[in-house]
Amino acid sequence: MKRARRAAPLPKKRRNMFAQLGIERVDYKDTSTLRQFLSERGKIRSRTVTGLTVQQQRQVTIAVKNAREMALLPYPGQG
């Protein structure tokens, strides 16, 4: 007896976090905004968690790395 196939789940619509926060460009000096994209251990959260587009995730990643370099944000495992 064959099993019934399940219908493929509908993809979730991505919410634009930058539009919700009123951000056009990510700035490494804006640590309060960047902390929203970090875990409690200081790691950068993935796109699936944050709901960002590829380009936005790259901007956040670069900004977080610059902020870490300038000692505005901690490196993972140190905070």
From Swiss-Prot:
<keyword id="KW-0687">Ribonucleoprotein</keyword>
<comment type="function">
    <text>Binds as a heterodimer with protein bS6 to the central domain of the 16S rRNA, where it helps stabilize the platform of the 30S subunit.</text>
</comment>
<dbReference type="GO" id="GO:0022627">
    <property type="term" value="C:cytosolic small ribosomal subunit"/>
</dbReference>
<keyword id="KW-0699">rRNA-binding</keyword>
<dbReference type="InterPro" id="IPR001648">
    <property type="entry name" value="Ribosomal_bS18"/>
</dbReference>
<dbReference type="GO" id="GO:0070181">
    <property type="term" value="F:small ribosomal subunit rRNA binding"/>
</dbReference>
<keyword id="KW-0689">Ribosomal protein</keyword>
<keyword id="KW-0694">RNA-binding</keyword>
<dbReference type="InterPro" id="IPR036870">
    <property type="entry name" value="Ribosomal_bS18_sf"/>
</dbReference>
<comment type="subunit">
    <text>Part of the 30S ribosomal subunit. Forms a tight heterodimer with protein bS6.</text>
</comment>
<dbReference type="GO" id="GO:0006412">
    <property type="term" value="P:translation"/>
</dbReference>
<dbReference type="GO" id="GO:0003735">
    <property type="term" value="F:structural constituent of ribosome"/>
</dbReference>
<dbReference type="Pfam" id="PF01084">
    <property type="entry name" value="Ribosomal_S18"/>
</dbReference>
<protein>
    <recommendedName>
        <fullName>Small ribosomal subunit protein bS18B</fullName>
    </recommendedName>
</protein>
<comment type="similarity">
    <text>Belongs to the bacterial ribosomal protein bS18 family.</text>
</comment>
